[in-house]
Amino acid sequence: MSLNYIKNFYEGCLRPPTVIGQFHTLFFGSVRTFFLGVLGFAVYGNEALHFSCDPDKRELNLYCYNQFRPITPQVFWALQLVTVLVPGAVFHLYAACKNIDQEEILHRPMSTVFYIISVLLRIILEVLAFWLQSHLFGFLVDPIFMCDVTGLGKILNVSKCMVPEHFEKTIFLSAMYTFTIITILLCIAEIFEILFRRLGYLNQPMT
């Protein structure tokens, strides 16, 4: 029986009950993850090594880099991907435990409500991630970062630091914002698909 639960959970995660949900899984699981894993590493992989300040000393560079990046973009986006997956995973675990097939989810009022709640939670998490990303990284990466070095007891309170490949990072940052907006729109469209399909089931003649 436990193997059947795992099978149902696995199929639910890969094949949601809606067409838009299946496209979202493909887009989310393939394109977005590939973009972050491959291109994200290429753009941000050696950022800390090439981040240099004036004067160019390791202690100062590390201090200012930690000020420039309270959290690295790769870690933030990886956490975003995992967090947004949680509501859907919890729902499909519930469906697997209740032995609800994917084809039956939208036929049952209670499971439909739970599924809509999971989609709404995904929207909320994506909006929250968008806000956090804008707060942490902004929308443009400037080539110069003015670092406050007061905590190091330096004569000068500000050190000028060079941000490597700032233009590439701006492009990548814009792409991640775009991915977030696309997934939000897909989730909204999925809710409309669910509502239309439920109306279709309710309007079917009784046999």
Curated annotation (Swiss-Prot):
Source species: Danio rerio
UniProt keyword Membrane, yes or no: yes
Keyword Heme: no
InterPro entries per the UniProt record, alphabetical: Connexin, Connexin_CCC, Connexin_N, Connexin_N_sf
Subunit annotation: A connexon is composed of a hexamer of connexins.
Main subcellular location: membrane
Function: Has significant hemichannel activity. However, has only low-efficiency gap junction activity and probably does not function as a gap junction channel in vivo.
UniProt-annotated location(s): Cell membrane
Bilayer topology term: Multi-pass membrane protein
Disulfide bonds: C53-C161, C64-C147
Cytoplasmic side of membrane: 1-22, 96-111, 197-207
Family statement: Belongs to the connexin family. Beta-type (group I) subfamily.
UniProt keyword annotations, A-Z: Cell membrane, Disulfide bond, Membrane, Transmembrane, Transmembrane helix, Transport
Spans traversing the lipid bilayer: 23-43, 75-95, 112-132, 176-196
GO MF: gap junction channel activity
GO cellular component annotations of the record: connexin complex
Extracellular compartment residues: 44-74, 133-175
Protein name as annotated: Gap junction epsilon-1 protein
One of the protein's GO biological processes: cell-cell signaling
Classification of source organism: Eukaryota, Metazoa, Chordata, Craniata, Vertebrata
